[in-house]
Swiss-Prot record, chain A:
A single GO molecular function term of this UniProt record: nucleotidyltransferase activity
InterPro entries: CTU1-like_ATP-bd (IPR056369), CTU1_C (IPR032442), Ncs6/Tuc1/Ctu1 (IPR000541), Rossmann-like_a/b/a_fold (IPR014729), TilS/TtcA_N (IPR011063), tRNA_thiolation_TtcA_Ctu1 (IPR035107)
Localization per record: Cytoplasm
Record NCBIfam families: TIGR00269 family protein
Protein name (Swiss-Prot/TrEMBL): Cytoplasmic tRNA 2-thiolation protein 1
Main location: cytoplasm
Highest taxon in the source lineage: Eukaryota
Record's signal peptide: none
Keyword Iron (UniProt): no
Phylogenetic placement of the source organism: Eukaryota, Fungi, Dikarya, Basidiomycota, Agaricomycotina
Similarity comment: Belongs to the TtcA family. CTU1/NCS6/ATPBD3 subfamily.
EC number: 2.7.7.-
UniProt GO BP: protein urmylation; tRNA thio-modification; tRNA wobble position uridine thiolation; tRNA wobble uridine modification
Length: 354, 510
């Protein structure tokens, strides 16, 4: 059988079956359409302006490794004029983060980008290992998720950047759309397909890989020989998310466009005005100054529970009542430093390329 | 004395959560022992029937009057006739039963059950059921039950028309008898000129093709995935019902979608890119073109069982002794999005009974993000603009696409020196193209391919027949160059033209 020619350029020999479209295309065209689609995502949403300082949330996994590579390349190819940084969060999970942080440090060298690693220990006084030893394996993802989001914003504030880009891919977003519908989480459903989110006092966050399939990111890393660490978190994976992920993978196998079709669906609707009116207004945490839906932000609530030896108080209402019954938080309680949005120069020294 | 072993972990001895809350007594009357458990609540047989019929009426009655105001129960007056869609499945059979018993005097469950018939008319003499003469009519004329036989699409499938007819006619033998008009349709009617002449205006002459059944099979076999065959079938059934309803001057079409099926449809629709019309899945209003070409009065498609789960439907059918004919449930095999979603949702419903209701309630809070600028020719639901630009931006398939060259992109490195541009099949001009007139989901249905090899396609059919309403509407679509907004009145769609119109969608040429 004669080799297939690329469905896009009609010249070179087709090398891959593109996961997103099922088309058989050559390697060069694969690189080019992958990169151009990310570029389209960036330009369509007017994500950046020349001179922006942008931090790439880097975990050392496939998504952020490819993101760092592609961001650097697009920045040069299309002259975005961005100043790029790498920002990593060290959750303090022995054996999980150590190797991937090495990848990030190597990326720092390869891409010639300044790197900042911010640890949970440094920010909250607790590592995830210490948290798990107190709360057990159940519910520890709640702590990690809440702490990571705030840590990224705080790290970005320290770097004095305008913008954080994360490696969330199309599969992640499609899965979140489905999960939010099944959980009835209207507030998140309304914003989960936005390419860029920005709280009043926080730094802009965007997802340039919003339309990039996970399989294509892996394929890109493979052909470009980008090395990354693929380690599952050693603490329990979220069971409900697991269900949705398996379902999504089945849908993708049935019809590969399903992932992007779900994202299109998520972008096509919004929450009705009358429902929006009932949603809570954003406020500022009284204790740490970070954006919050309540008087205390979730991170401060969780941290107070940990510090007072009642870790579940941030998770169940019953434990919260028990904590409240014991009186107000003591004055000497360890708290998160007050959040200062970026202003002027970097607040901390960053590791520059040696 | 207890022989419990104190060293055993207490948690390990904990009984599983009972399937019902607290007591075995009915939560409603608090007297009788319960017979069924619905989402952890116990109901006795006597309380179960009013529970379901109340939910049924609550879902239906607010949309009966053209404007939902005034005391509803006294003044239920629809602007047209009623058409009930019956598939032979559980939901629609239960719905037909509820319609007959609630509005058309079929013996109520209380009469059928152990209890003696009430001395006073149930619901008071003002209740529509107990009124007589002209006053009793909520809908004009005789209500119709419409069944669409789909066996033509799936060789080897059983023709159930006669068995469904018996179900409908069984209401004529009850006391008091009530006869519905039974309208049996076939899926291939969508390609049958004779049927179309009865419901729509013939503005064009379709290509002299083979029989309707061959046209249907050619249409379905041209689709690229199992998923597409399932959703195309659903669309054909929906439009056949709607055009039939319009021809009978119906104001309401009732479908027996249960809460479970609604959740499946919502998730499956979203997974196929139909997020823009998510609100239409629960409740929609449609206006077609009548025989003389003008828009018909709006027809409301109501799903009165949208608050009743599949389990409650099954209990209703069992206690009322309903005969369920069954339906040809083609969900696209094990590899169709329809069947994957159905398995997923019914599995979730088993473990987390509230999930289906959460999905439906969440989707009821959604609305399309922007206004619609037209209607999809195929499914006739509102279509979003800019769909093709979105698709070409997020999934590049060609360097020749207008949006690619106009955005100032460089050529890919390996083509930078090439003098000739890649040769692609010539695209027909946009005005003659079907693509701009399709919604995202229908375009995806016609074009999105499977990763596991395509559905077997017929090699001899060069022209894919389309449902007749598509051809009729296409002939009325103004061209993009036609700035005066003039509309083509009559135009013959030849073979070549039809081919050009859908050239981009044909997959069997490759």
């Amino acid at each position: 059988m004669a080799p297939q020619t690329c469905a896009i350029c009609q010249k070179a020999k087709a090398m891959v079956k593109r996961p997103k479209t099922g088309e058989q295309i050559c390697r060069e065209c694969f690189f080019y359409v992958f990169e151009t689609e990310v570029h389209n995502t960036i330009t369509q949403a007017n994500l950046f302006k020349p001179g922006d300082r942008v931090a790439i949330g880097a975990s050392g996994g496939k998504d952020s490794t490819v993101l760092a590579y592609v961001m650097k390349m697009l920045n040069e190819r299309y002259q975005y004029g961005l100043e790029l940084f790498l920002l990593s969060i060290d959750e303090g999970i022995t054996g999980y983060r150590d190797d991937s942080l090495e990848t990030v440090k190597r990326n720092q060298q390869q891409y010639d980008m300044p790197l900042k690693i911010l640890s949970y220990d440094e920010l909250y006084g607790w590592t995830m290992d210490a948290i798990v030893s107190q709360v057990g394996r159940k519910n520890n993802c709640t702590f990690c998720g809440v702490f990571r989001r705030q840590a990224l914003d705080r790290g970005a504030a320290m770097l004095n950047v305008d913008h954080i880009v994360t490696g969330h891919n199309a599969d992640d977003i499609a899965e979140t759309v489905l999960m939010n519908i099944m959980r009835g989480d209207i507030a998140r459903l309304g914003r989960c397909t936005s390419i860029c989110t920005q709280g009043e006092d926080t730094i802009r966050r965007s997802k340039p890989f919003k339309y990039a399939y996970e399989k294509e990111i892996v394929m890109y890393a493979y052909f470009k020989k980008l090395d990354y660490f693929s380690t599952e978190c050693i603490y329990s994976p979220d069971a409900y998310r697991g269900h949705a992920r398996v379902f999504l993978k089945d849908l993708e196998a049935a019809r590969p466009s399903a992932i992007i079709d779900i994202i299109h669906s998520g972008e096509a609707f919004e929450v009705r005005e009358e429902v929006k009116a009932t949603q809570r207004v954003q406020q500022v945490c009284q204790r740490c100054g970070y954006m919050s839906s309540n008087a205390l932000c979730k991170a401060c609530t969780l941290l107070e529970g940990l510090e007072r030896g009642m870790a579940n108080s941030g998770i169940t209402d019953r434990a919260r009542k028990k904590l409240d019954a014991e009186g107000p938080a003591p004055d000497n309680l360890r708290t998160i430093p007050f959040f200062k949005p970026p202003s002027g120069g970097p607040l901390i020294a960053i590791e520059s390329v040696s | 004395m207890s022989c419990e072993n104190p060293s055993v972990d207490k948690d390990a001895l904990m009984a599983r959560r009972p399937k019902f809350d607290k007591t075995k007594q009915c939560v409603k009357c608090k007297e009788r022992t319960g017979n069924v458990v619905i989402r952890h609540a116990v109901y006795c047989k006597s309380c179960f029937f009013p529970l379901i019929s109340t939910r049924f009426r609550k879902s239906l009655e607010p949309s009966v009057n053209p404007t939902p105001d005034g005391p509803r129960r006294k003044a239920l007056k629809a602007s047209g006739s009623l058409l009930v869609g019956l598939s032979g499945g559980l939901g629609s059979t239960v719905m037909l039963d509820l319609v007959a018993k609630t509005y058309f005097g079929a013996p109520s469950v209380a009469d059928l059950g152990e209890e003696a018939p009430p001395s006073k008319p149930k619901g008071g003499k003002e209740h529509p059921r107990n009124m007589t003469g002209k006053d009793s009519e909520i809908w004009r004329g005789v209500p119709a039950v419409c069944y669409v036989e789909v066996c033509g699409a799936f060789p080897g499938a059983e023709d159930r028309t006669e068995r469904v007819r018996q179900v409908v006619e069984s209401y004529a033998t009850t006391s008091p008898p009530f006869a519905f008009d039974f309208i049996p349709l076939r899926l291939e009617d969508a390609f049958d000129l004779e049927w179309w002449k009865g419901v729509g205006e013939l503005l064009f002459t379709p290509p002299p093709s083979s029989t309707p059944i061959l046209a249907l099979q050619a249409y379905l076999s041209s689709l690229p995935t199992q998923t597409a065959i399932h959703s195309a079938t659903q669309t054909l059934v929906r439009l056949l019902l709607l055009y039939t309803a319009a021809s009978r001057r119906a104001s309401h079409v009732l479908l027996g979608t249960s809460l479970t099926s609604l959740s499946v449809n919502l998730i499956s629709g979203i997974a196929q890119g139909a997020g823009f019309s998510v609100a239409e899945e629960a409740m929609e209003e449609w206006r077609g073109e009548g025989k003389s070409g003008e828009l018909t009065p709006p027809i409301r498609i109501v799903r009165p069982l949208r608050d009743v789960g599949m389990k409650e439907c099954a209990i209703w059918a069992w206690w009322c002794g309903l005969r369920i004919v069954g339906r040809e449930r083609y969900l696209g095999g094990t590899q169709g999005i329809g069947s994957l979603t159905r398995n997923f949702i019914t599995g979730l419903e088993r473990d987390y009974p509230a999930t289906v209701s959460t999905i439906a309630r969440t989707c009821a809070k959604l609305t399309p993000k922007e206004g619609s600028d037209g209607v999809c020719l195929l499914c006739q639901r509102p279509a979003q603009h800019g769909v093709q630009e979105w698709k070409s931006r997020t999934s590049i398939r060609s360097y020749n696409h207008a949006s690619f060259s106009s955005s100032g992109h460089e050529r890919p490195p390996h083509l930078a020196n090439a003098t000739d541009r890649p040769q692609h099949r010539t695209e027909p001009s946009p005005s003659s193209h079907l693509t701009p007139h399709l919604c995202y989901a229908c375009h995806t249905t016609l074009t999105s391919r499977s990763s596991r090899g395509n559905v077997k396609q017929t090699s001899d059919s060069k022209v894919v027949p389309l449902p007749l309403w598509v051809g009729a509407s296409l002939s009325l679509v103004p061209t993009s160059e036609d700035s005066s907004g003039e509309v083509w009145a009559t135009r013959r769609m030849g073979d070549g033209e039809m081919k050009a119109a859908i050239g981009d969608l044909l997959l069997n040429d490759s």
